[in-house]
């Protein structure tokens, strides 16, 4: 609790939860785990001082300033492993951030429909062992619409694990100048998914 009236006035009245946050620390930048290039950073007007990454401590300061109580960090899986421009952030890497600040961060397990049973086991591990609270899917990175058959086992496992899955739908951006991804995740395609999985969150 704030100790003074001045401090209290600086705290937003309503605390929020940021449901999709990409880890963008110097570690992810140095390891090529961001998925975008300098052209994208300029396109979205990212301040120059952020191009090298933002420390976890700075994340927390920004969360406090914006009135964000908790953020959901994505252990991203973006594209098949052998595709140019693809990248991923290991589940354990995101779990370490969550363990460091358990009252501020929770993990989301990125999913790759092309990995089959391996992905289902990975999702079990993320939820049951690491304490992740949901799954996350980037359809455009796989050039795969959300109603594709390869996605269905993942949706079924999410229902079994009683976790939500979130995904990026709609118009896609140009993240990398040399890798153009199609806008395959049209929102209407979730209609059939919702019909087939009425209990999917």
Residue ranges and their predicted role:
Residues 4-150, 157:
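Mid-domain alpha/beta scaffold segments of enzyme catalytic cores
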Residues 130-134, 144-201:
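Catalytic pocket-lining loop regions of alpha/beta-barrel enzymes
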């Amino acid at each position: 609790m704030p100790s003074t009236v001045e401090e209290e006035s600086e705290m937003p009245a309503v605390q929020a939860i940021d449901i999709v946050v990409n880890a963008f620390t110097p570690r992810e930048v140095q390891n090529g785990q961001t998925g975008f290039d300098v052209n994208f950073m300029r396109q979205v007007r990212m301040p120059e001082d952020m191009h090298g990454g933002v420390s976890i401590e700075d994340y927390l300061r920004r969360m406090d300033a914006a009135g964000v109580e908790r953020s959901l960090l994505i252990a991203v899986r973006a594209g098949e492993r052998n595709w140019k421009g693809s990248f991923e952030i290991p589940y354990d890497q995101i779990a370490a951030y969550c363990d460091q600040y358990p009252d501020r961060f929770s993990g989301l397990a990125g999913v790759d429909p092309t990995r089959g049973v391996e992905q289902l086991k990975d999702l079990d591990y993320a939820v049951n062992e690491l304490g992740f609270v949901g799954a996350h899917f980037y359809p455009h990175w796989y050039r795969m619409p959300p109603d594709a058959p390869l996605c269905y086992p993942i949706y079924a496992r999410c229902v079994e694990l009683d976790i939500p899955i979130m995904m990026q739908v709609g118009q896609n951006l140009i993240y990398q100048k040399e890798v153009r991804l199609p806008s395959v995740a049209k929102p209407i395609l979730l209609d059939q998914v919702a019909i087939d999985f009425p209990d999917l969150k």
